[in-house]
Amino acid sequence: TSGLYQKAWPEIVSAFQALGLGDPKEFYDAIVTAGFAIRNGEVGTLGELSPKPHPWLYAEAARVGLGIDFTQRHYVIGIEDSGAGVCSIRLAGFAPIGFAGGNINKGGTRALCTHFADRFDQILSLL
């Protein structure tokens, strides 16, 4: 999301450090965010134009940012801590992994998650 630099990116870096996975920029093929590219060659999208729970952000990130054809959508997962994000992932045709700390449980969207994790290391074991 556009909150990448304020919230998501520091949490991603922290999780990678805690799990001993090194630099997340070296781990992923690309890091696609709403609004900003992390480094040259990566694609950012403007999720503010169609905010969650609209599926456009996830669908466009997979198609344009990662080059994944819609027919291959069953290979795509999304990790979210918000109910709107889970809905967005599901509406895009992807499998959502819910992550604790957001409003998934309170919002009643946990049942839409393919899996749910309380900790990042649990997500790693699902991949």
Residue ranges and their predicted role:
Residues 1-2:
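Conserved phosphate-coupling serine/threonine residues in phosphotransfer and NTP-handling enzymes
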Residues 5-127:
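Asp-based, Mg2+/Mn2+-dependent phosphohydrolase catalytic module
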